[in-house]
């Protein structure tokens, strides 16, 4: 980037103030924002004169608006990409104090304000992006909930504050991309609020709406009751995206540490899953043991029942044989009563036999179920042993990774110390070099003085020689 100071020999207070203001403010219409990999580059379109110009320059407004749209789109790309990467590395729910998230909302606010028509009120002209956002509930019914919530917030007094609250609630709802796409597709409604060459009316708005889909992977939580959204100043912090020349020194070490931390988090997550699986299997084993105990008790009861039925059947057989024998020996008049008793005994015997068959069938079923449960318990025990072995191996790997992490951290600290020492040595060498350069200049000046004196002496000698002759 070229220097912004005016080429004047004697600065005046007016030019100093203008220079300071220009150094503190970056106008999107005078610079082109481009992306160099993952970094932001600001390239000056033309030389900016910092002295007051009595005749204003006449530039093409369409060109300036197109340049602003391109700059805002590139800023949105960087902001969204940086927010997603930092949120995933952080691995937790984001809140309103998170700096990349604050910058994302600032960039979105600038995108929504670009090319916004000014509405005339009693207090003057007012530009607010709350009007277009209110249209979303007519296009997407799900947005009516957050619009009503924004209107019910007691601390919001200005349309700008309501628009900022709406953006935060839409991000929490993970519907911001859907709402923006629905709004951009209705150009006939947006034309009431935006100029024809505004960002929301051009292709850049659709690109930004597509980029917002990636934000659905992050979780955000905002408490807007105590937050002052009306008086916040939406200034883009370019320092978060400008590349530092010294930032690439520890890239390799940081990448290794990041990879190790990712592996550590993966192993810990796998360990938690395995512990949960082991707990579930242990609960199943306990339940099967209780069921096995219950089945054993039921089997003992069934065996006792079978023994009782066998004894009763033997007794009935003896009684029936005794009755038959007595019928053969007794008089005929008693045979009718004895026949009835015999039929009742046979009926009772048949019922007892059927009951015995049912009990034996149930016993066989209980035995088969017990065998199946024993087989399932053996398989579960084998699975638990395998899981425990895998868990021990993973814990060993985790310990190794932790040791490697400490070793890399120590090496990184040592390398940082070496870099610091080298930088100090380099600064001392530069200081000595500067001193030697100053000494050389003094010697050269002395040499020049001596040459001049020699020339003077030669000329004086030449003048004296003819006089002697």
Curated annotation (Swiss-Prot):
Keywords: Cell junction, Cell projection, Coiled coil, Cytoplasm, Developmental protein, Differentiation, Lysosome, Membrane, Neurogenesis, Oncogene, Phosphoprotein. The keyword Coiled coil applies. The keyword Acetylation does not apply. It is found in: Cytoplasm; Endomembrane system; Cell projection, Invadopodium; Perikaryon. GO terms for molecular function: dynactin binding. The modification Phosphoserine is found at residues 34, 49. ARL8 effector that promotes the coupling of endolysosomes to dynein-dynactin for retrograde transport along microtubules. Acts by binding both GTP-bound ARL8 and dynein-dynactin. In nonneuronal cells, promotes concentration of endolysosomes in the juxtanuclear area. In hippocampal neurons, drives retrograde transport of endolysosomes from the axon to the soma. Plays a role in the generation of neuronal polarity formation and axon growth. Implicated in the formation of a single axon by developing neurons. PANTHER family: PROTEIN RUFY3 (PTHR45956:SF1), RUN AND FYVE DOMAIN-CONTAINING PROTEIN 2-LIKE PROTEIN (PTHR45956). This is Protein RUFY3. It comes from Homo sapiens.
């Amino acid at each position: 980037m070229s220097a912004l100071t005016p080429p004047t020999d004697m600065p005046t207070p007016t030019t100093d103030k203008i220079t300071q203001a220009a150094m503190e403010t970056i106008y999107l219409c005078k610079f082109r924002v481009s992306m160099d990999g993952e970094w932001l580059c600001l390239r000056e379109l033309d030389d900016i004169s910092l002295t007051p110009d009595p005749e204003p320059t006449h530039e093409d407004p369409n060109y300036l608006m197109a340049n602003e749209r391109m700059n805002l789109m590139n800023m949105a790309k960087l902001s969204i990409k940086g927010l997603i990467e930092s949120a995933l590395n952080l691995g937790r729910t984001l809140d309103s104090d998170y700096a990349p998230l604050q910058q994302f909302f600032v960039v979105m606010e600038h995108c929504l304000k670009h090319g916004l028509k000014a509405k005339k009120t009693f207090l003057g002209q007012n530009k607010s992006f709350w009007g277009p956002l209110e249209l979303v509930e007519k296009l997407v019914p799900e947005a009516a909930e957050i619009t009503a919530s924004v209107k019910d917030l007691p601390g919001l007094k200005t349309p700008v504050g309501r628009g900022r609250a709406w953006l935060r609630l839409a991000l929490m709802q993970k519907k911001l991309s859907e709402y923006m796409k629905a709004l951009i597709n209705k150009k006939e409604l947006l034309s009431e609020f935006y100029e024809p060459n505004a960002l929301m009316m051009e292709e850049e708005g659709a690109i930004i709406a597509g980029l917002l889909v990636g934000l659905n992977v992050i979780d955000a939580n905002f408490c807007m009751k105590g937050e002052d959204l009306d008086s916040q100043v939406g200034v883009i912090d370019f320092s978060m995206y400008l590349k530092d020349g010294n930032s690439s020194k520890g890239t390799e070490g940081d990448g290794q540490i990041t990879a190790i931390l990712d592996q550590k988090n993966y192993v810990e997550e796998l360990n938690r899953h395995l512990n949960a699986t082991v707990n579930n299997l242990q609960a199943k084993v306990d339940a099967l043991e209780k069921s096995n105990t219950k089945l054993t008790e039921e089997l003992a009861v069934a065996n006792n029942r079978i023994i009782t039925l066998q004894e009763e059947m033997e007794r009935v057989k003896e009684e029936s044989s005794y009755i038959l024998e007595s019928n053969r020996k007794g008089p005929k008049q008693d045979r009718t009563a004895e026949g009835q008793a015999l039929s009742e005994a046979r009926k009772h015997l048949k019922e007892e036999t059927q009951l015995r068959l049912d009990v034996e069938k149930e016993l066989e079923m209980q035995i088969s179920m017990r065998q199946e449960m024993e087989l399932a318990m053996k398989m579960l025990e084998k699975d638990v042993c395998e899981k425990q072995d895998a868990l021990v191996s993973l814990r060993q790997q985790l310990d190794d990774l932790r040791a490697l992490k400490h070793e890399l951290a120590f090496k990184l600290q040592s390398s940082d110390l070496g870099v610091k020492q080298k930088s100090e040595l380099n600064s001392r060498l530069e200081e000595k070099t500067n001193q030697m350069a100053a000494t050389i200049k003094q010697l050269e000046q002395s040499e020049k003085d001596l040459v001049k004196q020699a020339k003077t002496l030669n000329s004086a000698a030449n003048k004296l020689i003819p006089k002697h002759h």
